[in-house]
């Protein structure tokens, strides 16, 4: 079941790629391990950055969410230093309905609109709330250092 669903999503994504994203298997013979590329949204401090994300599907997919992690360092209240992402649709709000394409679009939205009320990194969330311009300049510096090379 999982491999059929993943194969179908891959075909759909190749036909209709999500905006500013691409994804596919790391190795042709292993459909369960993907690498994605997310372009930093223009209306965010991540603009101009290219972010690599790993997507690991289990044999229980789509009944369990894929494990999605940033491989590129990113300064964000909902993404920690290990690349873990705090996004409700990858946790308690998961349902079998969303496709990988929709998950990637949700991650792009999170880059544009962080959720400081449900942070993985409380210090960054605090800065976002009290000094947004300092948060944005730090995020831009990290983007230049880690995602533009």
Swiss-Prot record:
The EC number(s) this enzyme carries: 2.3.2.23
Catalyzed reactions: S-ubiquitinyl-[E1 ubiquitin-activating enzyme]-L-cysteine + [E2 ubiquitin-conjugating enzyme]-L-cysteine = [E1 ubiquitin-activating enzyme]-L-cysteine + S-ubiquitinyl-[E2 ubiquitin-conjugating enzyme]-L-cysteine
Pathway(s): Protein modification; protein ubiquitination
InterPro entries found in the cross-reference section: UBQ-conjugat_E2_core (IPR000608), UBQ-conjugating_AS (IPR023313), UBQ-conjugating_enzyme/RWD (IPR016135)
UniProt entry keywords in alphabetical sequence: ATP-binding, Nucleotide-binding, Transferase, Ubl conjugation pathway
Example GO molecular function: ubiquitin conjugating enzyme activity
GO biological process: protein ubiquitination
Active site: 86 (glycyl thioester intermediate)
Free-text tissue specificity from the UniProt record: Ubiquitously expressed at very low levels.
Chain ranges of the UBC core domain: 1-148
Family according to the record: Belongs to the ubiquitin-conjugating enzyme family.
Protein name, UniProt field: Probable ubiquitin-conjugating enzyme E2 12
């Amino acid at each position: 079941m999982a491999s059929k669903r993943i194969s179908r999503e891959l075909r759909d994504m190749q036909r209709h790629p999500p905006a500013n994203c691409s994804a596919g298997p790391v190795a042709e013979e292993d459909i369960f391990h993907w690498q994605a590329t997310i372009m930093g949204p223009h209306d965010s401090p991540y603009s101009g950055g290219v972010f690599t994300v790993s997507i690991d599907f289990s044999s229980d997919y789509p009944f369990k969410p894929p494990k999605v992690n940033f491989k590129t360092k990113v300064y964000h209240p909902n993404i920690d230093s290990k690349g873990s992402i705090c996004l409700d649709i990858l946790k308690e709000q998961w349902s079998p309905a969303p496709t990988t394409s929709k998950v990637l679009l949700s991650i792009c939205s999170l880059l544009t609109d962080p959720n400081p009320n449900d942070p993985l990194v409380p210090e960054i969330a605090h800065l976002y709330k009290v000094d947004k311009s300092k948060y944005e300049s730090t995020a831009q510096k990290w983007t230049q250092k880690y995602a533009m090379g």
